[in-house]
């Protein structure tokens, strides 16, 4: 998969099933975290056309923006703040069907309508999060959660 993804035109789950082995092969041969995060963000954006795909990395007491695909984003997020900070604090995946209904949502873009945030764990500790935003309401479900959690195990 060095330069090209091979993804069919099936449903969401079929696309994840085709993407996962390609991503695993890509990140398992590269030791640089930033390179891997950048390629994962690009692959997810290319495959699914999400509005925004990116990573935040834990640096001391806040999440700091890492590689991403999409419009300019919030640079720093405190523990427990917004969807990303809450997923970090709780150590679990959060699916938000309507970001306007999430208490304390941080609006990096008014075009973001729904969101999923998946923690990246290393030895049981959250070291970052994968954040994906859609410009449509209710874009994410347990299928996304299951496959994105698996992708995050490749990174952690």
Describe each PLM feature range.
Residues 121-134:
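Sensory-domain boundary capping and coupling elements
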Residues 114-121:
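A short, aliphatic-rich beta-strand micro-motif
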Residues 52, 117, 129:
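Short hydrophobic/aromatic beta-strand element in the GNAT-like acyltransferase core
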Residues 47, 107-112:
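Short loop/turn motifs at secondary-structure junctions and domain boundaries
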Residues 58-108:
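Regulatory sensory and allosteric helical modules in signal-transduction proteins
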Residues 1-67:
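Intrinsically disordered, low-complexity terminal regulatory regions
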Residues 2, 20, 24, 134-156:
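Juxtadomain coupling helices with adjacent low-complexity linkers
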């Amino acid at each position: 998969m060095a330069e090209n993804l091979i993804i069919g035109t099936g449903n969401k789950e079929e696309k994840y099933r085709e993407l996962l082995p390609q991503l695993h092969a890509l990140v398992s041969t590269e030791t640089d975290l930033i390179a891997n995060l950048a390629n994962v963000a690009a692959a997810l954006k290319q495959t699914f056309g999400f509005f925004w795909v990116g990573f935040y990395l834990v640096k001391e007491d806040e999440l700091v923006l890492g590689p991403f695909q999409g419009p300019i984003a919030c640079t720093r997020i405190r523990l427990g703040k917004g969807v990303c900070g809450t997923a970090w604090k709780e150590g679990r995946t959060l699916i938000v069907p309507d970001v306007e209904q999430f208490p304390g949502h941080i609006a990096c873009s008014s075009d973001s309508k729904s969101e999923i945030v998946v923690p990246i764990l290393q030895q049981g500790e959250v070291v970052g999060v994968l954040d994906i935003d859609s410009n449509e309401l209710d874009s994410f479900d347990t299928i996304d959660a299951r496959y994105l959690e698996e992708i995050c195990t490749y990174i952690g």
